């Protein structure tokens, strides 16, 4: 693997193709998007558990993109090019992780952790206190050797929910590009 970073594009919906400048796109690494994210045409992988979005992305994705879906949904599209079944997430079984029941961004994050990387960057990640934040923190705790980077928008503030986690950093896009150039590419 030439680039040791996996970037997740979450469910927030604020990160549009015009925000993906050349420098950022060269440093983003493997891109996994949640469902029909605005950047699905640029993605290496699309993770979806929404039947309508699955139908759309299977028919409209870029040629290089692989679509990942839960087994029940995957079975309907098995003959399409570049669609795969999401893996069995052994590390998440004790949490009763269900690929059909979680959000698409959580499915994308679980997939990134399953693929494995020393650094996983979260762009456009929707933080929501009832379901998303507990799931996100649980996954981050299961993978303590993975550095998670929560990439803030240019005018966004840091959030305090990750203060107790040593493997989480909150940085902006400029800091992300600098960090990638300085450290990640050298791994």
Predicted stretch roles:
Residues 1-187:
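Metal-ion/cofactor- or nucleotide/acyl-coenzyme-handling active-site neighborhoods
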């Amino acid at each position: 693997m030439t680039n040791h970073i996996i970037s997740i594009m979450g469910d927030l919906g604020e990160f549009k193709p015009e925000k993906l400048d050349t420098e950022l796109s060269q440093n983003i690494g493997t891109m996994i998007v949640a469902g029909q994210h605005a950047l699905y045409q640029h993605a290496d992988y699309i993770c979806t558990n929404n039947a309508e979005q699955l139908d759309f992305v299977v028919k409209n994705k870029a040629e290089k993109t692989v679509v990942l879906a839960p087994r029940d949904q995957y079975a309907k599209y098995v003959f399409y090019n570049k669609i795969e079944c999401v893996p069995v997430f052994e590390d998440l079984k004790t949490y009763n992780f269900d690929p059909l029941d979680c959000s698409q961004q959580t499915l994308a994050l679980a997939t990134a952790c399953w693929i494995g990387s020393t650094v996983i960057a979260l762009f456009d990640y929707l933080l929501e206190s009832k379901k998303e934040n507990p799931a996100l923190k649980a996954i981050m705790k299961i993978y303590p050797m993975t550095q998670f980077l929560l990439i803030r928008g240019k005018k966004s503030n840091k959030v305090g929910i990750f203060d107790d986690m040593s493997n989480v950093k909150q940085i902006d896009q400029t800091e992300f590009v600098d960090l990638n150039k300085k450290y990640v590419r050298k791994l």
